[in-house]
């Protein structure tokens, strides 16, 4: 059986955009051919898509670094570089992707591509920089880097119905009887270590059902399999509480109260969810006696009597669950953020920051400056002049002069180092 993993950190790196090209038309009988350097292709994106056959994030343990293909650089004759190939990753339904504590994607639909990392924009070729004043520009741009970050991947099983109960209450037997699931069944506790998903068909209708591993007292505090599985109940529309009413060594009242307490103690108070109580193991002799005791203490709780092993009343239970889902169809699944609420603030970050490292050394940084350095390669005189003009336009040179920069001083702009001249 696959190990159940429902939270993992991975690196995502979308493709870099292809570089633009510097090229000039060179053909026989064509005098003074103009610029024909093409643009680079966009970098590949990374998408997540739901796979109903998956119920664990185990695959990310084997591959914690996911990348997409880079875009191809532009070519001569105005040829555009090809777009980088997208990477599509199959994940369980109910997978959430977090970046810096903010939800990037919530995989809640089938057959839908969820963008989790965007590829970088391709650089422009020199054909795009032709003007009446510069008919032969030796200017091109680098492709921009694709989005890269450490993603926190969290799985919260997405199902119409969630089965809960103490170990060995018969949940696995019931999901097998109700659906197409093939959950492991045995006469010992904690047979279910991985949530099992099944599809229940009721005439022309269907709904999904999840068998969640058995809970024990203190689960809401993390005991046993604990809180790891309680969070999966958050995303179920309806909770079916299975109680063993037939075994001689089980007290159904205590069993019922123990689970209700754990559901109530969880941070979202899961007892507020629509809930059905199912009394299992009606084929055993002690069943009727326990039913009477339970009804005496909880006369207002409606219970559904079944034997999952013998399929007694299972078809009727399918109908009851469907009708219950229909009654609660107006309720929306509440998606709670496991992390701190992010407050959106206006970004007052300046275009650039100047630091005086010593008497003759100035350092220029900033998000806009970094983007400029990445975009413009200093490999031709025209590119250098463009780089210089943009810095001048946004006020970097004026700011350096106000900081009393002198001829010969060093100006460091990320990987570039220049010597200051009096006239720029």
UniProtKB/Swiss-Prot annotation:
Which keywords, in A-to-Z order, does the entry hold?
A: Cytoplasm, GTP-binding, Hydrolase, Magnesium, Metal-binding, Nucleotide-binding
Which residues are Mg(2+)-binding? 172, 192
What Gene Ontology terms describe where this protein resides (cellular component)? cytoplasm
What are this entry's molecular-function GO terms?
Answer: GTP binding; GTPase activity; magnesium ion binding
Native source organism of the sequence: Mycoplasmopsis synoviae (strain 53)
Under the heading PANTHER family, the entry gives: DEVELOPMENTALLY REGULATED GTP-BINDING PROTEIN-RELATED, MITOCHONDRIAL RIBOSOME-ASSOCIATED GTPASE 2
Source species taxonomy: Bacteria, Bacillati, Mycoplasmatota, Mycoplasmoidales, Metamycoplasmataceae
Quaternary context? Monomer.
Which BP terms does GO give this entry?
ribosome biogenesis
Q: What is its EC number?
A: 3.6.5.-
The molecule here is called GTPase Obg
Where in or outside the cell it occurs: the entry states:
Cytoplasm
Q: Which residues form the OBG-type G domain?
A: 159-326
Q: Where does GTP bind?
A: 165-172, 190-194, 211-214, 280-283, 307-309
Q: Where is the OCT domain?
A: 344-422
């Amino acid at each position: 059986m696959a190990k159940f993993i429902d939270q993992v950190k991975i690196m995502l790196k979308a493709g870099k955009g292809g570089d633009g090209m510097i090229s000039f038309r060179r053909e026989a009988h064509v005098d003074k051919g103009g610029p024909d350097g093409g643009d680079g292709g966009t970098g590949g994106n990374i998408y997540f898509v739901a796979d109903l056959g998956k119920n664990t994030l185990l695959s990310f343990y084997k591959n914690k670094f996911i990348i997409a293909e880079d875009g191809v650089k532009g070519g001569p004759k105005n040829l555009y570089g090809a777009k980088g190939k997208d990477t599509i990753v199959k994940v369980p339904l109910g997978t959430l992707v977090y970046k810096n504590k903010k939800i990037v994607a919530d995989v809640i639909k089938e057959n839908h591509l969820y963008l989790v990392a965007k590829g970088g924009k391709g650089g422009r070729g020199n054909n795009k920089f032709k003007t009446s004043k510069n008919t032969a520009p030796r200017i091109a741009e680098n492709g921009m880097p694709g989005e890269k970050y450490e993603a926190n991947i969290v799985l919260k099983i997405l199902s119409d119905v969630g089965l809960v109960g103490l170990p060995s209450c018969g949940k696995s037997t019931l999901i097998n009887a109700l659906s197409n699931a093939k959950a492991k069944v045995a006469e010992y506790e904690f047979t279910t270590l991985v949530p099992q998903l099944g599809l229940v068909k009721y005439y022309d209708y269907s709904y999904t059902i999840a068998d969640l591993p058995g809970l024990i007292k203190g689960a809401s505090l993390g005991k046993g399999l604990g809180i790891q599985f309680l969070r999966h109940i958050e995303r179920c529309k309806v909770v079916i509480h299975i109680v063993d009413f037939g075994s001689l060594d089980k007290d159904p009242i205590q069993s019922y109260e123990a689970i209700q307490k754990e559901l109530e103690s969880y941070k979202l108070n899961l007892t507020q969810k629509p809930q059905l109580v199912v009394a299992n193991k009606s084929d055993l002799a002690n069943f009727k006696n326990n039913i009477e005791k339970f009804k005496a203490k909880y006369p207002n709780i409606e219970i559904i009597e079944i034997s999952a092993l013998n399929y007694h009343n299972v078809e009727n239970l399918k109908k009851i669950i469907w009708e219950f889902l229909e009654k609660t169809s107006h309720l929306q699944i509440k998606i709670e953020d496991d992390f701190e609420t992010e407050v959106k603030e206006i970004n007052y970050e300046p275009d650039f920051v100047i630091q005086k490292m010593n008497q003759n050394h100035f350092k220029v940084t900033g998000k806009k400056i970094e983007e400029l350095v990445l975009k413009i390669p200093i490999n031709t005189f025209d590119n250098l002049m463009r780089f210089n003009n943009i810095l001048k336009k946004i006020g970097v040179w004026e700011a350096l002069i106000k900081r009393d920069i002198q001829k010969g001083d060093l100006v460091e702009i990320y990987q570039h180092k220049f010597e200051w001249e009096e006239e720029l």
